[in-house]
């Protein structure tokens, strides 16, 4: 570029920085090798599937799936991890269904969790925006998008039709929220439900409420589904749950994490340490017996879970070795060009 054009460009950039603040315009190469900050999901298996050691900060995450599949459980584990590291968490309970006893069992510090149960969708999203813009909250969870009922629908008569009202509400809210979430480095998790499209003969009839905006604005989308029931004798004690990363802007997508969600306890940390330990040759399995460093831990997975609960130092040691081997570290993760693909979007 010749000197005259460069001078003109420098003048324009100076004027823009004067009007809009420093950093309003920059060269893309200035951000080369930047670091993607992340917050652990509370599950080493899911952290590995997400590719950057957890949920990326300053991004929007959508967690969706059928009823009772474990969506809220997954989000509550993330809140517990943030609080464990001294962060601040807020929960927008649009469904008015959060169980504080269960949340506490998952490790959530309920005395320091900011909770809002809004009267209508606009109120819930305004509260979420206020938390984000404060810059003082590390994670905001909205449970759920489907329950963010527009004010006009609540005040109207039963049976009134409000075509596209919720979709317009979400679209407007996300336009306002996305920039603020990025600047404040807040992790925003939106939990969503599943609906069936009427009259679909071919292809997947499932869709998520709230229009397409959330699909576009989300950096990560997780599909949570029950795979099978877990039993002790005849008693059902939990579910084997598949969490599929269907969209990921910060790492390769389509990875799948399988975790055990136990009733009243949440994700079984012992269960995933056993599974990943065997998979990565840290835990030895011979028949039904499991061993670590030559010492037998037990026969059968449930007995080994009990052993690890009684010997937490062994569990922590295996967990640490797993994170080292898989390259999962808390906090900042280097984002190299080859690890950061272009925007990927999957239509359900």
UniProtKB/Swiss-Prot annotation:
Gene3D superfamilies: P-loop containing nucleotide triphosphate hydrolases. PROSITE patterns: RECA_1 (PS00321), RECA_2 (PS50162), RECA_3 (PS50163). GO terms for cellular component: cytosol. Pfam families: RecA (PF00154), RecA_C (PF21096). ATP binds at residues 65-72. Its main location: cytoplasm. One of its GO terms (biological process) is SOS response. The keyword DNA-binding applies. CDD domains: RecA. One of its GO terms (molecular function) is ATP-dependent DNA damage sensor activity. It is found in: Cytoplasm. Keywords: ATP-binding, Cytoplasm, DNA damage, DNA recombination, DNA repair, DNA-binding, Nucleotide-binding, SOS response. The keyword DNA damage applies. InterPro entries: AAA+_ATPase, DNA_recomb/repair_RecA, DNA_recomb/repair_RecA_CS, P-loop_NTPase, RecA-like_C, RecA-like_N, RecA_ATP-bd, RecA_C_sf. Can catalyze the hydrolysis of ATP in the presence of single-stranded DNA, the ATP-dependent uptake of single-stranded DNA by duplex DNA, and the ATP-dependent hybridization of homologous single-stranded DNAs. It interacts with LexA causing its activation and leading to its autocatalytic cleavage. Belongs to the RecA family. HAMAP family: RecA (MF_00268). PANTHER family: MITOCHONDRIAL DNA REPAIR PROTEIN RECA HOMOLOG-RELATED, RECA. This is Protein RecA. It comes from Staphylococcus haemolyticus (strain JCSC1435). The gene is recA.
